[in-house]
Amino acid sequence: MANLHLLTVEILTAALGLGLLALGLLVPHSDRRGIAYVATAGLAGILAAAFGMREASGVVLGGYVIDPFGTYFKILFLVAAMLTAACSYDYVEKMGLNQGEYYALLVLATLGMMVLASSGELVSLYLGLELMTITFCILAAFHLGDAKSAEAGIKYVLLGAMSSAIFLYGLSLVYGSSGTTVIREIGQAVATRGASPALLLGTIFILAGFAFKVTAVPFHMWSPDVYEGAPTPVTGFLSVASKAAAFAALVRVFFGALPDLHSFWVQLFIALAVLTIVLGNLVAIPQTNIKRLLAYSSIAQAGYLLLGIVSFSVLGVGAVMYYAMLYVFGNMGAFMAATAFYNNDGSDEIKDYAGLARRSPLVAALMLFSLLSLAGIPPMAGFVGKFYLFMSIISRQYIWLAILGILMSMVSVYYYLLVAKAMYLGNPPEGSKPLRVAPGLQVAMVVSLLILFILGIYPTPLTNYAMNSAVTFFMP
């Protein structure tokens, strides 16, 4: 019980989520814009608390692990949630959505991701996964009266339920084979008893469940439709934060519980990475809707992150952590630009972005440089992230995988530049007006743009933080 202070971040997040629900019921409709500000300020305060605990370590309640690895991801989730809240102000009002419920679900999804990232035990890991999934199911269908949003919610519920069942069955097989639900103890049991057929089957099922959450091929089919139909800010949050949470849990399970099966599962990860990188990039080329293009781009980015898992090293885990943080600003930047455009023109079609640079230089610049960062073009921050990912697999002699990743990154430049071509070389429609962007969204956009440049030119502070956190994860 003495270690309960280590749960400060989670307790504050839960309190904020419940408080926002209460405010949604108590605050008059005309004053509900204030709920958005409370959510953003609350997340900022929790972010400060998480940063202050970045070196804290300990185990709470027998299986909940507080360590620099988990805290790094909590900081990532909070940053993503703040950016999502900032770009939701106008969107939520325009769509007539319930602000209290919307921001409460956003915060509770963040709580689920925190639990997922710090779980050192299978039951709490599953509970965190379900809290995250259920809140995202509601958020995906939150745009009432919109058929695509309803379709997105239904697809996410049905396919999410199926993946959760597969994942839970895998957990039960691993528990039956090891006799414990504590991740470190599972690793000790596997090292002592060896691999049984049930354990290998459970490993495959767990990997399939994680693959659904990170949108790895062939478990990706839900993401383009869900991303297109969900509210745009939610799509950005879903594509970034939930993926990072799944990777955090994936590292804990496969590196903590199943390291002795590395020679077995690494082949599965290689196959997933290759399929995900290739299909994600190739299918993105013909897309005409910006959210679908970013959905397939997000699939490809998951493939690059899988390369860090394949390397099975401190460098690989550190590279995953570093790239995941950059991915927040790159992908969220693109979705913030898409949100600003949708708030004004009500369209997500790339052809309608024609002449955007003349209507809003800031929105066009954020979209352009976010996409260039995702492509890994220097001096953007994404270049440094991909450099570390490729170096991690080259150090393990997977040179062909690095070459494939570089070639597919070159392919991604093509479809990203199709968006840039429309924005900078196209002509805006006659009578079109300059885009009106809310002050809060403008601040978030400028911050994202600056961070993409700063971390591309001077990445040392974040690389050191990510690598040091990865080192502590491998300590006994």
Swiss-Prot record:
Sequence intervals crossing the membrane: 7-27, 33-53, 59-79, 100-120, 122-142, 156-176, 199-219, 237-257, 265-285, 305-325, 363-383, 399-419, 437-457
Record's subcellular location: Cell membrane
GO CC term (a single one): plasma membrane
Entry keyword annotation includes Endoplasmic reticulum: no
UniProt membrane topology term: Multi-pass membrane protein
Catalysed reactions listed for this entry: a quinone + NADH + 5 H(+)(in) = a quinol + NAD(+) + 4 H(+)(out)
EC nos: 7.1.1.-
Top class in the EC scheme: translocase
Key words, A-Z: Cell membrane, Membrane, NAD, Quinone, Translocase, Transmembrane, Transmembrane helix, Transport
Principal location: membrane
GO-annotated molecular function: NADH dehydrogenase (ubiquinone) activity; NADH:ubiquinone reductase (non-electrogenic) activity; quinone binding
Pfam families in UniProt: Proton_antipo_M
The protein's assembly and partners: NDH-1 is composed of 14 different subunits. Subunits NuoA, H, J, K, L, M, N constitute the membrane sector of the complex.
Record protein name field: NADH-quinone oxidoreductase subunit N
Lineage of the organism: Bacteria, Bacillati, Bacillota, Clostridia, Moorellales
